[in-house]
Amino acid sequence: PGATLQXAXXLLVAVXAXPPPPLGVXPKPXPG
């Protein structure tokens, strides 16, 4: 359990700090 929490945390920290995902992944804003 401890290892899973650590990995998740780490993963959350990496996502957060990391750069934003490509526009293709995220939802595209509408043209309006």
From Swiss-Prot:
Membrane topology summary: Single-pass type II membrane protein
Required co-factor(s) are: Mn(2+)
Q: Which enzyme class?
A: transferase
Q: Where in the cell is it found?
A: Golgi apparatus, Golgi stack membrane; Secreted; Cell membrane; Cell projection, Filopodium
**Pathway, per record:** Protein modification; protein glycosylation
Q: Which GO terms describe its biological process?
A: acute inflammatory response; angiogenesis involved in wound healing; binding of sperm to zona pellucida; cell adhesion; cell population proliferation; development of secondary sexual characteristics; epithelial cell development; epithelial cell proliferation
Q: Name one GO cellular component term.
A: extracellular region
Q: What is its EC number?
A: 2.4.1.-, 2.4.1.38, 2.4.1.22, 2.4.1.90
Task: Indicate the secretion signal residues.
Answer: none
**How this protein is processed and modified after translation, per its record?**
The soluble form derives from the membrane form by proteolytic processing.
Which molecular function terms from Gene Ontology are attached? beta-N-acetylglucosaminylglycopeptide beta-1,4-galactosyltransferase activity; galactosyltransferase activity; lactose synthase activity; manganese ion binding; N-acetyllactosamine synthase activity; UDP-galactosyltransferase activity
Provide the reaction this enzyme catalyses.
D-glucose + UDP-alpha-D-galactose = lactose + UDP + H(+); an N-acetyl-beta-D-glucosaminyl derivative + UDP-alpha-D-galactose = a beta-D-galactosyl-(1->4)-N-acetyl-beta-D-glucosaminyl derivative + UDP + H(+); N-acetyl-D-glucosamine + UDP-alpha-D-galactose = beta-D-galactosyl-(1->4)-N-acetyl-D-glucosamine + UDP + H(+); a beta-D-GlcNAc-(1->3)-beta-D-Gal-(1->4)-beta-D-Glc-(1<->1)-Cer(d18:1(4E)) + UDP-alpha-D-galactose = a neolactoside nLc4Cer(d18:1(4E)) + UDP + H(+)
Give the record's keywords alphabetically. Cell membrane, Cell projection, Glycosyltransferase, Golgi apparatus, Lipid metabolism, Manganese, Membrane, Metal-binding, Secreted, Transferase
Q: State the family it belongs to.
A: Belongs to the glycosyltransferase 7 family.
Q: What does this protein do?
A: This protein is responsible for the synthesis of complex-type N-linked oligosaccharides in many glycoproteins as well as the carbohydrate moieties of glycolipids.
Name used for this protein in its record: Beta-1,4-galactosyltransferase 1
User: Encoded by which gene?
Assistant: B4galt1
